[in-house]
Amino acid sequence: MTALLALEDGRIFHGESFGAEGTTTGEVCFNTSMTGYQEILTDPSYRGQIVAMTYPEIGNYGVNDLDVESDAPQVRGFVIEELSPIVSSWRADTDLGGYLKKHGILGIQGIDTRALTRHLRTRGSMRACITTDTTDPSGAIEMARKASYEGVDFVKEVTSTEKHLWDSESRQSREWIIRRGSEEIVDADARGNVFTDLPPTTHTLAALDFGMKKNILRSLRRNGFDVTVLPATATAEEVLALGTDGVFLSNGPGDPEALDYARKTVSDLIGKKPLFGICLGHQVLALALGAKTFKLKFGHRGGNQPVKDLRTGKIAITSQNHGYAVDPASLPADVEVTHVNLNDGTVAGLRHLKHRASSVQYHPEACPGPHDAEYFFAEFAKEVAAAKTNA
């Protein structure tokens, strides 16, 4: 079946449908990762967006029930150049097209995604429409122009509905296929998926869920945190009532300026508990500290973003997924920039000079992407331990 991708500026790309049929709209963005499409599809940070992959062939290893970052796809649509005609992985449960169709997500293939990417790099991210009704291209352009993204609170669509202790039996935290030689394999299921042992929990943590990826939770647990997840709308009083040792601010979708409730909560927590934020959590922390954010021209999305630690001079290749950034000129004097993105010089990390509050504008947990920055979870554990010692 034919399909088309219509951009709000009038550009149209023709292709073939895979996945569900119908029409969808959202902000179209591109991701430069070569693999990890399943994690990308299920990352809540992509809520409200149509994702285009720059790598030319997608779908060759299918989809399985373990490598997900949430319980269902979060994207509005998926754009690729070529869908792999075969699935070659012993871990696959289904193929990519069947997975998208099951969840009602439209996909379009046969598009020159690198031409699309160049267009978005030149013109900036924009609203778009994917439709299998190719009889009215002008109507598809109009639907793209009417789509809403900026200022929309997508966090309320993906946050937890109630407070809960995550993975109380540690089963999910032990599920991990990729072995790096440092963990002891203690169990395996019938399909050969292996499970590792975990360190004992030494700290308690309240995690504000703005759209948290599962591997963030796994990473926190692997670093000794017992995590209680709270809805994004939780107040500072509700967080402090838990009596946890620290507070984590998660990733999530959309415009941070739309989250006044989260900004107030975090503002009220600064100086009372050690804080660490990732991605949207980084932006919310910056807003709570009095800074401003702005929309990037086309965002940072992929597993090859170089970041420099200004304190050590070291470079890390990081996984990133955001369309907004912190304005460094708006940061107060008692907040320092600790990391910068080497591609465009934008703020990639910050910390408060007086209080235990820090954040990074990327994903230390990867999934997908490199593991250069996963040490941040251990560093946060040290911060929490120091705060407990000095309490």
List the predicted regions and their residue ranges.
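Cysteine-nucleophile active-site neighborhood
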Residues: 241, 245-246, 251-325, 369-387
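Catalytic beta-strand/loop cores that center a nucleophilic Ser/Cys/Thr
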Residues: 313-356, 391
